[in-house]
């Protein structure tokens, strides 16, 4: 099934922007949301010739009351919605108990509470129309609790994965599909400064993500190589080894 009308959050930069460009190249209609409306307006202008239709809406996903309003407005602008990609996220974080609780709380509020608010809004639409595809962008970091500055981030993404798994169990056999995507290291602003041999170039990473989304598999590590075997290994490796991998 082709999902022609797609909402993407966190679409002003990084993987969200990359997915918007890739889906636009496939002729899809896009509802793009992010905090930086100026960047969304500029992106929409660039995509106008390829995409079926592009509508934008400023949205801070931590404003949980505004999320359903934003989704309703975007769906109206698109003439409906077939897929929602819950992508908006934050990579801040600090070692727990070091006086930087605000950064960790903001990370969890954005990545997990914001994702829940988006899932609520998307699922309300999908339940009403009895079809749709909810895509939750998690992370390889969700597979294993990570130390230091990544502790809150990995916990927030583990929550996103668990949310997706719960919905999959509930919706099994229904016309509403749920996919959980776990990206590894892909070149974006959030990963700038990370030194690893496992980094994937942006365009290749985005293509892998879009291919996984289009497949509508329940769970996809992307790119599959090397992240699928790494994800499997992370569940069993000693802490010292897993921390070095991711």
What residue spans do the PLM features occupy?
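Conserved glycine-rich Rossmann-like NAD(P)H-binding loop of the short-chain dehydrogenase/reductase
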Residues: 26-43
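Conserved glycine-rich cofactor-binding loop
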Residues: 12-13
């Amino acid at each position: 099934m082709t999902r022609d009308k797609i909402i993407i959050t966190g679409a002003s930069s990084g993987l969200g922007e990359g997915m918007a460009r890739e889906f636009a190249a496939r002729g899809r209609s896009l509802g793009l949301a992010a905090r930086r409306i100026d960047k969304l307006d500029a992106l929409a202008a660039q995509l106008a010739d390829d995409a079926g239709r592009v509508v934008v809406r400023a949205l801070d996903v931590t404003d949980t009351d505004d999320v359903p309003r934003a989704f309703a407005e975007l769906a109206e602008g698109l003439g409906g919605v077939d897929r929602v990609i819950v992508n908006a996220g934050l990579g801040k974080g600090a070692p727990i108990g070091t006086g930087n609780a605000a950064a960790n709380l903001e990370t969890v509020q954005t990545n997990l509470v914001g994702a829940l608010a988006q899932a609520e809004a998307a699922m309300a639409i999908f339940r009403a129309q009895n079809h749709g595809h909810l895509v939750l962008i998690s992370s390889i970091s969700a597979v294993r609790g990570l130390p230091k500055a990544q502790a809150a981030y990995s916990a927030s993404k583990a929550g996103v994965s668990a949310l997706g798994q719960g919905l999959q169990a509930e919706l099994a056999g229904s016309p509403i599909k749920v996919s959980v995507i776990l990206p590894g290291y892909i070149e974006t602003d959030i990963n700038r400064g990370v030194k690893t041999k496992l980094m994937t170039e942006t365009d290749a990473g985005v293509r892998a993500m879009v291919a996984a989304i289009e497949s509508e598999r329940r769970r996809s590590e992307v790119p599959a190589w090397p992240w699928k075997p790494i994800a499997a290994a992370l569940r069993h490796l000693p802490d010292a080894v897993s921390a070095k991998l991711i």
